[in-house]
From Swiss-Prot:
Its main location: membrane. GO terms for cellular component: membrane. It is a single-pass membrane protein. Belongs to the cytochrome P450 family. Keywords: Heme, Iron, Membrane, Metal-binding, Monooxygenase, NADP, Oxidoreductase, Transmembrane, Transmembrane helix. InterPro entries: Cyt_P450, Cyt_P450_sf. Disulfide bonds: none annotated. Its EC number is 1.-.-.-. It comes from Aspergillus flavus (strain ATCC 200026 / FGSC A1120 / IAM 13836 / NRRL 3357 / JCM 12722 / SRRC 167). GO terms for molecular function: heme binding; iron ion binding; monooxygenase activity; oxidoreductase activity, acting on paired donors, with incorporation or reduction of molecular oxygen. Disruption phenotype: Fails to produce aflavarin. One of its GO terms (biological process) is secondary metabolic process. Pathway: Secondary metabolite biosynthesis. This is Cytochrome P450 monooxygenase afvE.
Length: 471
């Protein structure tokens, strides 16, 4: 249906329609088409085709191109450069992740009193859960991206958050009009203009620091022998390795590469703050609605802290399988084709430019794969006999698709789940939290193929009593 005709069309229940399509098509091994937020269409592939598409190389199946089209990102930033993904792989090692963990812990420690309240305040404080957690995650993400001093740069964080918040609404605004009018909407709409202005302001703030880090990298040989100090350092080193930047001097294209690195930092911030915040928001909703989880999770992390010498390290998380299971259950509960492809398993040919998807949420709610799938079970993945979370929290499979699967699986899933667990459990250790409503509102809502947290839920928080924690 055209955008013009859709103005008069009635709304439909996304979750209900996707569930019906899953039963009618996916469960019988057939693909089906669905309309996306950008007025394009995607092909939802059944699970019996997984073995074929999960091994397709990046030049045939590109998540970055799909995201660029899906969210209209190609209109304002370069999303197709693979340097950010390669930089994440470069940072996916114990030494670097441990360093990032210290940044997360320190940033969370500094930000919590500013966002939620000081430890000395004993009274309950009313706050919006969605915006509180989103602000906290944005602060922590900035520390991992640029270093500890930038986690307190409120001006930069607020500007980049405003840009992030406007991405999907501006996409919906522009694509709600007929194609012939979209260039005018992009140029004249107050929403789109404000988003572009925030993007420009953010790049202006980032540019001097990126240039400074490049100069440091060029002046110090072996500067990353101990690993990158931040994701920006990892990006710069990856750009050196690829030849995008010269290690010795400016070849005359530094300004162009710096602008690209700034866009990649902005993309990193969006990916490490917004989806992570959504996971934590859902986890907080569960805790408020199921208080029986609070004490076991606190006790587990208290014991884990003792095993790691009293400091919150990366190893602390390794001793907290219940926490890992709880977060993985939160992830459960709550691609674009580059070249012509033929999937033999379902006899389907895909043209270049086709966006493909997997029926993730419906698979996660399928009783054939999960017992009592519509009931939240925080210990679903906890193996009590072994004291482990099985499978591991970041392990993907055809029936656990939160981070996609195969070659196109999210390369930052290890870092994302690390940030999620760290922020959530530190929040739970430091604060009591309860629902500020008489009864729990809906956790979230379906928005096309995505399931988003309810932004109107209010919580009440106060500092925990020290003797309750035992740490």
């Amino acid at each position: 249906m055209s955008a013009c005709l859709r103005w008069w069309s009635r709304k439909f229940d996304c979750e209900k329609e996707y569930a019906e399509a899953y039963k009618q098509y996916s469960k019988t091994g057939k693909p089906y088409a669905t309309r996306l937020k950008n007025n394009d269409h995607g092909i939802v592939l059944p699970l019996n085709s997984t073995k074929e598409w999960r091994t397709l190389p990046h030049d045939q199946l590109s998540f970055l191109h799909a995201l660029s089209e899906f969210a209209d990102l190609y209109m304002h930033i370069n999303m197709t450069d693979r340097t950010p993904l390669q930089a994440v792989h470069y940072c996916n090692n114990t030494k670097t992740l441990s360093r990032f963990n210290r940044l997360m812990v320190d940033a969370t420690d500094r930000a919590l009193p500013l966002i939620v309240g000081k430890d000395t305040e004993s009274e309950w404080k009313r706050a919006n859960a969605f915006h509180t957690i989103l602000s906290l995650c944005s602060t922590v993400a900035m520390s991992v991206l640029l270093g500890p001093e930038f986690s307190m740069d409120t001006s930069l964080i607020q500007t980049i958050m405003m840009y992030n918040t406007a991405i999907m609404p501006s996409c919906a605004k522009r694509t709600s009009y007929p194609r012939i009018l979209r260039p005018f909407v992009w140029r004249l709409s107050p929403l789109c203009r404000a988003m572009k202005s925030d993007l420009t302001k953010t790049k202006i703030k980032l540019t001097p620091e990126i240039k400074h880090r490049i100069d440091i990298a060029r002046s110090k040989k072996g500067w990353l022998e101990e690993g990158p100090m931040s994701l920006l350092d990892g990006l710069i080193e990856t750009a050196f390795e690829k030849g995008c930047l010269s290690r010795s001097s400016d070849r005359g294209d530094d300004d162009q590469q710096v602008a690209l690195l700034a866009e990649e930092i902005i993309f990193y911030h969006f990916e490490l703050s917004t989806p992570v915040a959504f996971f934590i928001i859902f986890a907080v909703y569960v805790i408020m609605n199921n208080k029986e989880y609070s004490t076991p999770l606190r006790e587990e992390i208290s014991e884990a802290l003792k095993l790691s010498g009293g400091s919150f390290t990366l190893d602390t998380l390794n001793h907290a399988p219940k926490l890992a299971s709880f977060v993985k259950e939160t992830c459960r509960f709550f691609r674009r084709v580059m070249k012509p492809i033929h999937l033999e398993s379902i006899n389907l040919s895909l043209k270049p430019g086709t966006i493909i998807m997997a029926p993730g949420r419906d698979v996660h709610l399928d009783p054939d794969y999960y017992d009592n799938p519509t009931t939240f079970n925080g210990y679903r993945f906890y193996d009590a006999s072994r004291g482990t979370c099985t499978p591991h929290i970041s392990t993907t499979s055809p029936t656990f698709l939160t981070f996609s699967h195969g070659i196109s699986a999210c390369p930052a899933r290890v870092l994302a789940t690390q940030i999620t667990r760290t922020i959530f459990i530190m929040f739970l250790l430091k604060f009591d939290v309860e629902l500020a409503h008489e009864e729990m509102p809906a956790y979230g809502f379906a928005n096309g193929p995505a399931y988003l947290p309810n932004p109107s839920v209010m919580m009440r928080v106060r500092p925990c009593q020290k003797d309750v924690l035992g740490v």
